[in-house]
Curated annotation (Swiss-Prot):
Transmembrane regions: none
UniProt keyword annotations, A-Z: Ribonucleoprotein, Ribosomal protein, RNA-binding, rRNA-binding
A Pfam family of this chain: Ribosomal_L10
The protein's name in its UniProt record: Large ribosomal subunit protein uL10
Gene Ontology biological process terms, A to Z: translation
Purpose of the protein: Forms part of the ribosomal stalk, playing a central role in the interaction of the ribosome with GTP-bound translation factors.
Database matches in InterPro entries: Ribosomal_uL10, Ribosomal_uL10-like_sf, Ribosomal_uL10_bac, Ribosomal_uL10_bac_type, Ribosomal_uL10_CS_bac
The UniProt record lists the keyword rRNA-binding: yes
Family per record: Belongs to the universal ribosomal protein uL10 family.
GO cellular component assignments: large ribosomal subunit
PROSITE patterns given in the database record: RIBOSOMAL_L10 (PS01109)
Signal peptide location: none
Subunit structure of this chain's protein: Part of the ribosomal stalk of the 50S ribosomal subunit. The N-terminus interacts with L11 and the large rRNA to form the base of the stalk. The C-terminus forms an elongated spine to which L12 dimers bind in a sequential fashion forming a multimeric L10(L12)X complex.
Gene name in the database record: rplJ
């Protein structure tokens, strides 16, 4: 076989592995963004631990077939970039959605969330969720409230008994 075919097979395998390992994948059309804007977007994504790559659509379609995500085939028309996140499910959607608000040229087309195909609307809804840390802090404040109220009630009873005893 020729080396070009081997190289393409390696790229397809790489893309398929990224789709398998990724908790969240967002596909965007970046047509119309200049180099400075793309660099800024890549920087924001890199800081959040998100990998942002551009692959040929034909190779990506083959990788999707290998992974079993053929439903995304219609998304891969025109220039596309793919954001892969192996840790945070919300990060790529949030960063790309915020960037798209200030840069109309960036268009979110769809994605994959924990192995399930997601529409543009589902990606937008995911972007509106707080981060994992934000959700954990909300949970902790909800869990602390009853304990705090109980401690305040006990302190009030103790203060009242101290007043009566003095």
């Amino acid at each position: 076989m020729s080396s070009a075919i081997e190289l393409k097979k390696q790229v397809v395998a790489e893309i398929a592995d990224k789709f398998r390992a990724s908790k969240a994948t967002v596909i965007v059309d970046y047509r119309g963004l200049n180099v400075a804007e793309m660099t800024e977007l890549r920087k924001q994504l890199r800081e959040a631990g998100v990998e942002f790559k551009v692959y040929k659509n034909t190779l990506t379609r083959r990788a999707l077939a290998e992974v079993g995500l053929e439903g995304l085939d219609e998304v891969f028309t025109g220039p596309n970039a793919i954001a892969f996140s192996n840790e945070d499910v919300v990060a790529p959607a949030k960063i790309l959605s915020e960037f798209a608000k200030t840069h109309e040229a960036l268009e979110i087309k769809g994605g994959v969330i924990e192995g399930n195909i997601a529409s543009k609307e589902e990606i937008d809804a995911l972007a509106k969720l707080p981060s994992r840390e934000g959700l954990l802090s909300m949970l902790l404040s909800v869990l602390q409230a009853p304990i705090r109220n109980f401690a305040l009630a006990i302190k009030a009873v103790a203060d009242k008994q101290e007043e009566q005893g003095a």
